[in-house]
């Protein structure tokens, strides 16, 4: 996650005889200053895009809910945090990156467990989404549910191409 180390790594990768498309995956724990530096680096090195965000170690700003299975508060749990608790933080980071470079391919991940969460990520600026934890808890039905939900929103807003929704800030309508 260190922009200086990342620059050195990318120089080595770019020197390979064949370089596949590259996406940099960032953590939600980065400061906006570090994110800005990484965005500049991505433009300088012609990287294909960013995957935002993955597992977090930080518990600040998260809902401090009781976890039934362990009996502890979310803020007291150890290890990497993923899924729904990252949703708002991930949306904020996606919006920040999208405002820096509206042409950068952003893959949104972290807390996408419903059609509404997917729509929020897209309207925050993600042009693609990934699901992990949501898939584990909701199963394979999550994907068609997300697709149907997005289609309903596009119809509601009379949008013919999902690209028009990317970064639009449009809210979820029931």
Question: Across the structure, where does each feature detected by a protein language model lie?
Answer:
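Extended, intrinsically disordered, low-complexity segments
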Residues: 87, 95, 148-174
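Active-site-adjacent beta->alpha loops and helix N-cap segments on the catalytic face
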Residues: 1-19, 29-36, 59-65, 85-95, ...
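Glycine-rich phosphate-binding active-site loops on the catalytic face of alpha/beta enzymes
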Residues: 49-59, 111-112, 118-145
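Glycine/Thr-rich beta-alpha phosphate-binding loop at enzyme active sites
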Residues: 1-2, 43-103
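Short beta-strand/loop segments at the ligand-binding rim of alpha/beta enzyme cores
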Residues: 16-28, 96-108
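Glycine- and other small-residue-rich loops at beta-strand/loop junctions that grip anionic moieties
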Residues: 2, 24-27, 82-86, 107-111, ...
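Catalytic cores of alpha/beta
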Residues: 30-44, 97-101, 112-129
